[in-house]
């Protein structure tokens, strides 16, 4: 699961949308309805990043910020820092 999420993120960072679509679909298929909060929220963030990369900036930014907030609510400061840094690196103000 984590490997699929990392591959999805890498594809999005390099605007490789064809490959990103593959990893998005694969992750959708293997993520179950169990309580995998980290994985589900990381996927939520990356889907927002995909929207942003594809030009839907407002919706994408909103979804990425939601995911960062969820990591904060879950008490995961390392993930907050990681995704906030990613957000600031890729989102043009």
Regions found by a protein language model. Name each.
Residues 18-21, 58, 78:
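Residue register within tetratricopeptide repeats
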Residues 2-10, 39-46, 53, 79, ...:
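"A position-specific structural signal for the A-helix of alpha-solenoid helical repeats
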Residues 33-37, 73-86, 93:
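Acidic, Ser/Thr-rich low-complexity linear motifs
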């Amino acid at each position: 699961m984590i490997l699929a999420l990392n591959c999805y993120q890498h594809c999005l960072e390099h605007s490789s949308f064809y490959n990103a679509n593959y990893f998005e679909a694969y992750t959708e298929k293997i993520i179950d309805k169990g309580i995998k909060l980290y994985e589900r929220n990381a996927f939520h963030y990356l889907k927002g990043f995909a929207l942003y990369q594809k030009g839907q900036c407002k919706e994408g930014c909103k979804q990425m910020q939601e995911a960062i907030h969820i990591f904060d609510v879950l008490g995961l400061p390392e993930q907050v820092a990681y995704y906030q840094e990613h957000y600031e690196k890729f989102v043009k103000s």
